[in-house]
Amino acid sequence: MLLVAVVGAGTDVGRVASLFLKQQKVIKTLALYDDHPEHNVCGVANDLAHIDTSSEIEAYQGKMFLKDALHDADVVLICGGCCIQPPCCNSLDRDLFFYNMQHVRTSTLACAQFCPQAILAVQTPPVDCNYALCAHTLKVAGVYDKRKVLGVNAINAMRANQLFCSITGADPSKNQTPVICGTGRCTRVPVFSAAKAGNFPQTQVDCLTRLVREADEIICKVKSNTEQGHLSIGFSTARCVINIMRGLFEGPTFIDSALVEQGDPGKCYGMPVCATPITVGKNGVEGYAVPNLNEFEKRLLEDSKCDLEDMLNLGRCYAVGDEYYLHPQKTCPCIEWRPCQICEPKKAVKQK
């Protein structure tokens, strides 16, 4: 039986994820923590406690109880934080990182002290930055294990798989559509060629890729720019954590996509840190399933690499105290087919 802690459980994503985690028999204790005064995590826990499953619920409100929430946890989910409406590009992701970095750093330092053996799953946006912040904070603390730190990329893989299956009529439960490289709008690379019967015309692949990359922005606009897709994000995040628990408790379990430090960068297109399908076992990440790419996907990956490196470097700099500089190869933080209103002025200034 496992002890699972959810940091940020009072947020929209945290509440949805906690609802699904409460239903898992493998969890002995589900510890819900939040330090935001407006997030009534005790009320969330009391509500979930009415669900007649075997998992026990504990609630911790306030920073003074972070130690108790994390003590001897087997899995820690760091979620929640601020979101920019609508999500757009790396320029806004950098701003968002400054809002959320303290939440992630404080949680990571506490994990290093009170549950250094735990697997950390980072969902707080932007995941690319916060994964690096978490990993390098643990390195500074001397307890880093690359097998036990991952960035949650489940929402992007789930969206890509749903799009693919809605067109082909395939069963989503029997099909996987990997999303590699990173987790952000400018860094996610859906690999439709790896899915079964994925022989689409290039124009359709372009459209599907754009839908995956702009999914956050689309759903935000549908909701009148008031919120993101918390239900789908919470569900996919919970599914990722459940698969981690199955790997710990039952044996090797497949996860459709997670941002991790690769075992051999040479086998992952020269990228030491990359989101790929992985296998999780009793000691954490045990295997990396790097998909083969077609020419379009290879070009998209090359275009996305410097964006991912920039985001990872931003997180690293604030973990170790280095000064951050924008990646020298970056000209516009947006994806290639449509620069956004945020970045267009910056691009014009550079051309002068």
Segments predicted by a language model, with ranges:
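Conserved hydrophobic helix-helix packing surfaces used for dimerization/oligomerization
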Residues: L3-V4, L30, L120
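Conserved glycine-rich cofactor-binding loop
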Residues: G10
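N-terminal Rossmann-fold NAD(P) dinucleotide-binding loop
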Residues: G14-R15
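Conserved N-terminal Rossmann-fold NAD(P) cofactor-binding segment
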Residues: V26-A73
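C-terminal substrate-binding/catalytic lobe of Rossmann-fold NAD(P)-dependent dehydrogenases
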Residues: V140-K148, N153-P345, K352
